[in-house]
From Swiss-Prot:
Pfam families assigned to the protein according to its UniProt record, in alphabetical order: Ribosomal_L30
GO cellular component annotations of the record: large ribosomal subunit; mitochondrion
Quaternary organization: Component of the mitochondrial large ribosomal subunit (mt-LSU). Mature N.crassa 74S mitochondrial ribosomes consist of a small (37S) and a large (54S) subunit. The 37S small subunit contains a 16S ribosomal RNA (16S mt-rRNA) and 32 different proteins. The 54S large subunit contains a 23S rRNA (23S mt-rRNA) and 42 different proteins.
Protein name (Swiss-Prot/TrEMBL): Large ribosomal subunit protein uL30m
Single Gene Ontology MF annotation: structural constituent of ribosome
InterPro entries the record matches: Ribo_uL30_ferredoxin-like_sf, Ribosomal_uL30_bac-type, Ribosomal_uL30_CS, Ribosomal_uL30_ferredoxin-like
GO biological process: translation
Source organism (scientific name): Neurospora crassa (strain ATCC 24698 / 74-OR23-1A / CBS 708.71 / DSM 1257 / FGSC 987)
Primary location class: mitochondrion
Keywords: Mitochondrion, Ribonucleoprotein, Ribosomal protein
Biological role: Component of the mitochondrial ribosome (mitoribosome), a dedicated translation machinery responsible for the synthesis of mitochondrial genome-encoded proteins, including at least some of the essential transmembrane subunits of the mitochondrial respiratory chain. The mitoribosomes are attached to the mitochondrial inner membrane and translation products are cotranslationally integrated into the membrane.
Family under the similarity heading: Belongs to the universal ribosomal protein uL30 family.
Top-level taxon in the UniProt lineage: Eukaryota
């Protein structure tokens, strides 16, 4: 059995009582409220009376309130639409930077918070230098910064304090 998915798109403020009555009979009180009714002539007639105020779709089954809410919820996480071009001193502009070599070198030197190093390398060849921001990025100690400073040969973009 199919259903009408009816969503009140425009308010009925200032319209005749008859229009308010039709919306009440359909179960619509607030804007963007959605109700489901079976595809029957009586509901089709009501929809014709308020066709300027509602949006109607024919769907195969009713959705629960939870499913309606989940439809409005955005997808979790992030989507990389386009990677930012990066400037590396001595190399020039590159479309992609490979961090695997940097991370391997840091792990070999037993640097803690290796994941933070990937976050440290930012656009334009600059590194966040103040301690508060560095703490947010996961790089905790001055010795970590010194090790990173020694790695200019691996990735010239990473600089020490």
């Amino acid at each position: 059995m199919s259903f009408f998915r009816i969503t009140l798109h425009r308010s009925a403020i200032g319209l005749p009582k008859r229009t308010h009555g039709v919306l009440a009979a359909l179960g619509l009180r607030r804007r963007n409220q959605t109700v489901f009714h079976p595809v029957e002539p009586q509901f089709a007639g009501m929809l014709m009376k308020v066709k300027e105020l509602v949006r109607v779709e024919e769907v195969p089954h009713r959705l629960t309130k939870r499913e309606l809410k989940d439809e409005r919820k955005p997808d979790a996480g992030f989507v990389v639409e386009k990677q930012v071009r990066r400037f590396i001193p001595g190399v020039g502009v590159q479309d992609e930077v490979d961090f695997s070599k940097v991370v391997e070198e840091l792990k070999a030197q037993k640097v803690e918070n290796v994941e933070g190093v990937e976050k440290m390398v930012v656009e334009g060849g600059a590194v966040v230098r103040d301690g508060k921001r560095a703490g947010d990025l996961g790089v905790r100690t001055r010795s970590d910064w010194e090790v990173i400073g020694k790695m200019k040969s691996v990735l010239p973009k990473v600089k020490a304090l």
